[in-house]
């Protein structure tokens, strides 16, 4: 429903909260937000009650430039006498003076980082967080004069003779070493966000329990120091029945999350007991390191452990739906804890909480070792990680800090011709008002947790730093409105953490991106995300010189089919079989696919990647090795400084890791690669494939 009937008072409140009263749809039509929706969001976005430690304002500025802070942002009573103090992150006082000018406070240029500006009178104190940003996000030196490539995988999909039925950090180590030998400068993986141990089949890495904590299911257990010293667990592992179980899990074409989690916990629980009581010098030393880890991570680490303990009790049957996942399905008394109840539960479940904290420590330890392995292997970038838009509604993140999220709203996408009813992702948005009052500390912590072990970080739906489509609880996506976020401040933080962690940022910017957002992303040198499947314009694919330079280019993504499957329309067949697409809509999809394929063939002919006599009819031509290689070679020669090669495409495998618009109808997030890693890196044809990619990049 479109409406302009919004009172002036509500308009002013909405604009102050960043709620867009209108937007242009994909066809250029002006759509007005519904008054009821606007009113609901205004209520959700009211400033929190002023609390100790809260910031009154936040200002973003560039490093090494003079800073003018305009005091009308604070509404200071003019009758009082004020002084100000500037402190850095270590609380060292950099400046302390009497405030003589009540209009502008001028500060000297500062190095990049976080600062606090405090303004005092005898009765009042105002706290302003300064976000002093580098001019750009981190730019790896290797990209100054080289076009690089890497391999991208869904980590869980890897096969080997060593893993326990799911690709793990041991497989990732092998992939890093072998890819580096072939000339790759990074290995890209799916998000490693913590899932729900109580409901292991809720496996989407884009709908996790926490974006701050890691998925311990990827642990390479035999590589743990505790495993190497614990004879009883080693003996258990060698048992014929256990080896048979592991072999069966390896053979399966889909990851059996429930069985693998149960098996890994059967090993990890006695290993934790061994870790606690062993008197060997190595384990005693490790206990001291773990104690320091607990101290540094503090209560947030313990709360994710408590969440897992309670969730395992409440979901003992390991089943949940979207409206009962995580804390949404718990008894009422545990859904919203008082400080006293939280403290009591932390004490009651201390031992089990320590176990989950230990699993986080082990996971971080192995991931850190993997990034070091990248450097030792000669990779210039290392691990390419992925950051989801947000955690899911029933998550540990939301439960442990409910004020930070608007749980009575969801994020998604407005209606468009491809999705006439819009999209509801059922992810609760950050409350930007609360985020700003906290000086963006939760956002900073989350970014740092994701960047510290990666050389590259892809940010899913980077537009979310600028605005998100909010949907009121109980309403459809069509009833939503855009809510703007403090873009300048979030970009400043992104640049600070990127440079500190030496992490290149890729912003997933598919779809319509406003000019002001595109300009800002370019200013900060955030790499664009360029997908071949979506690159066709007016019946042509771009020439290699027309590919954006500051971009990561790839054939597909986790949400689209592999090249083989795309070419043979297997995804459309699946959508038809599942009743998602049929009739005229399905026919349009098939027609569009043929047009895209023909356009790609024509463009490859145009640029001499295919010889003149080569078959050029997309309707009758099947995908085959030569065409596959030429598409990759075309991508490799493109102007983009970074390209990604997906292992499923090298293997010519027909696969869709995720089929959008499905949940239980299709085995999303569990399909495996057709061949083990050892085959991929010993196969002569694939070695030649890697040589061609290197040649294309070095042109």
From Swiss-Prot:
EC code: 2.4.1.25
Enzyme class: transferase
Compartment(s): Cytoplasm
One of the protein's GO biological processes: carbohydrate metabolic process
Gene Ontology CC terms: cytoplasm
Sorted UniProt keywords: Carbohydrate metabolism, Cytoplasm, Glycosyltransferase, Transferase
Protein name stated in the entry: 4-alpha-glucanotransferase
